[in-house]
Amino acid sequence: AAGRVAAHCIVGAYTDRAALAELAALASGLAPDLEKSVGSLVQSDLLLESSGEQDKTYSFRHALVRDVAYESMLREHRRQLHERLVRDVIPDDEKQRVPELVAHHLTEAGLVVEALNYWKQAGYRASRASAHYEAIAHFQRGLTLIRELAEDAERERLELGFQAGLTGPLIASTGYTSEAVKAVVARTSELSKRVDNAPEIFSVLYSRWGFLLTSGSIFESYNAAREFSSLAERQGNKDALYARYRMLGASRMCLGELEAARLDLEQAVSLYRKEEHEGLITAYGVAIRVAARCFMGEVLWLKGFPDSARGNVTLALEEAKSIGHTHSIGMALYFCGLVSFLYRDANAVREYTEEMMNLASRQPLAAWPTLGKAMQGWAQLAEGDLDGGLPLMRQGIDSAKKAGISMFMPFLTTRLAEILLSLDRVDDAESIIADSEALMDRTGERNYEGELRRLKGELSWRQGLFEEAEAQFCAALEVARKQEAKAVELRATISYARFLAARGQPDRGCAMLSSIAAWFEEGKDGHDLVTAEAAIAALKGEARQV
């Protein structure tokens, strides 16, 4: 019976009757009395018997019994049994289905290189299933095992593969700006310089780009995207040649190059082929077309096409859900919320952020819920809950800052400043505006610079600094027009038109505002166009009285 206990503890979780019989035969010769022996172990309360669909399975009642039995075997004998279990017992389909089981037995058998292959398979398999913590554990197990190898070029090549694999689930679970991701990105960047022709080089460069973009090194992220693109062209890598458009488009959007960004992102959407590109989730940690549609939504809103913007992010969410990739779903929910936030649709913001928070309570969603919390706070404010909404919005912004997130922050901080101005908390608003400007100068994220200039104009006007106010309103219009950001230009024109009316020029303000409002073909029921039409009516009335 002791031999059967030992055999069983080697099998571990792989405990159906057939496997136990085969291993028992391997361990101590043919075992015609296996049924009797196992039965005696069950009667002795050492094993627990369970009936499955096709056969019975067995497990130890107490881990201590298993451990004692395992340690009672000679180390070399244990090693041989682990190896023979992989070679002779576990069927091939099971090896593909549960690679971590094979990896464990090969590790215990001392077959490091073979084990690494299966730990890597297990990591990627878990990552594809959005089991991020499990994937992290598998990749880290492999990295621990790699340390047993001699320090040479092959070891560095193997480590690069595992570090690159680890990056995706780390980003999905902790966000691009976490210390863990920062460390892995630094290590993979270092290794990639020493490993020639590494197949992981593109996922390494992509992760570095994502870190730079999210943490607020926008121009550096653009250079990283260009480096990725150039390498893809030199190597003729079709997958990377496709993925580059998502990267270039996102960086250009943040730089305020909206039309160039639109063209890049349009390529990422139109060139997508499911059979070729859906599998890129494994290398890049997100569905590329989903991400492209998300950023396209932001670009289109800025350019003055709010209905098209909402259509793009809605399609992104539908695609992410059809794929079933958690991180892609989280991203799409955030961008659905963001476009609704920019459109000032409080109900939609609340619905999308609540769905995101519910998903985040079950699975990690990186930094998306942190940013979502700030938008959730604004939705409460828009519905009249000042006491609950304002602290929640501040909390979301502060949490994002503490996490090292800079991208998207101008949308949130300028909205907060606008609210504070409306509450006559001028000093608080001035502080937020100054912080927003400093952040924008540091990161290079310029796609909402026009809104910042508009708010500086509103602040100066409130403070009685009329020349400065007019200069800021004009600067806002100049930036918005240069970027072709019609949504921002509309908001700046509303403010400037009101300012002109207050300074005795309502007809001039009315003409400017009527011109920009007439340009829009989408979003007629949106907050900003409704506000513009009301302002035009008021300005016409004032002009008649002059």
Model-inferred region functions:
Residues R79, V112, A129-H132, S178, ...:
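TPR-repeat structural position
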